[in-house]
């Protein structure tokens, strides 16, 4: 009986000793697997976020740039090159001007969003599904059926600028007066102006002039 008890005690001691030796190894393996899994998840999430940001840039900036190009330079070919969902319904000059106004309203909204992102970029990056939501937002702004850009411009941007127009003009006047009194600023502006004067100059007619009419014929 005593021999059996001694064997059980010895076996238990061996198990405990083995556990003590193996536990750190198992803990290390588990930590390595956990860290590896976290890195894979972070890499996958980062790759997905990068892809969504790229798609957001294509929709939010790439397409409007191309659309602006078509409306300014190729009015006769826009119906062939624009997707059907974004085509003008008729070829009247009034419709072209309305489409240009909607596009200018879009660029105003886009500028506001870009300015907000430059300030709140670090915080917005932590918002779940931010890139996906931004894609939906761009589509809502651009779609001629929803006319989201025109709505935001008329409802928020235009009233805000109208209410603060005097303050903005006053600030700009003071800024000009301040900068014109600073020799360093004047010298810097003279340098910038000299560099601008050295850039190539084109001889083109303004968008919306007779050149558009000639191209559309």
Curated annotation (Swiss-Prot):
It is found in: Endoplasmic reticulum membrane. One of its GO terms (molecular function) is membrane bending activity. It is a multi-pass membrane protein. InterPro entries: TB2_DP1_HVA22. GO terms for biological process: autophagy; endoplasmic reticulum membrane organization; endoplasmic reticulum tubular network membrane organization; macroautophagy; nucleophagy; positive regulation of autophagosome assembly; reticulophagy. It comes from Schizosaccharomyces pombe (strain 972 / ATCC 24843). The keyword Signal does not apply. The keyword Membrane applies. Belongs to the DP1 family. PANTHER family: HVA22-LIKE PROTEINS, RECEPTOR EXPRESSION-ENHANCING PROTEIN. Keywords: Endoplasmic reticulum, Membrane, Transmembrane, Transmembrane helix. The chain crosses the membrane at residues 9-29, 54-74, 103-125, 135-157. GO terms for cellular component: endoplasmic reticulum; endoplasmic reticulum membrane; phagophore; vesicle membrane. This is Uncharacterized membrane protein C30D10.09c. Pfam families: TB2_DP1_HVA22.
């Amino acid at each position: 009986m005593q021999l059996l008890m001694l064997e059980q005690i010895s076996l238990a001691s061996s198990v405990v000793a083995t556990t003590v030796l193996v536990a750190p190894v198992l803990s290390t393996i588990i930590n390595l697997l956990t860290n590896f899994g976290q890195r894979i998840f972070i890499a996958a999430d980062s790759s997905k976020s990068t892809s969504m940001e790229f798609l957001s840039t294509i929709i939010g900036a790439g397409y409007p740039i191309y659309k602006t190009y078509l409306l300014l330079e190729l009015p006769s070919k826009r119906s062939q090159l624009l997707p059907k969902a974004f085509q003008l319904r008729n070829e009247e000059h009034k419709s072209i001007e309305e489409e240009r106004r909607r596009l200018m309203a879009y660029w105003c909204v886009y500028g506001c969003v870009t300015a907000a992102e430059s300030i709140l970029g670090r915080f917005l990056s932590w918002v779940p599904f931010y890139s996906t939501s931004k894609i939906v937002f761009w589509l809502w702004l651009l779609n001629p059926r929803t006319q989201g850009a025109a709505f935001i411009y008329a409802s928020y941007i235009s009233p805000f600028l109208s209410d603060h127009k005097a303050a903005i003009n006053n600030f700009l006047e003071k800024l000009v007066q301040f900068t014109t009194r600073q020799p360093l600023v004047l010298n810097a502006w003279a340098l910038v102006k000299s560099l601008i004067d050295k850039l190539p100059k084109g001889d083109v007619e303004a968008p919306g002039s007779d050149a558009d009419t000639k191209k559309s014929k």
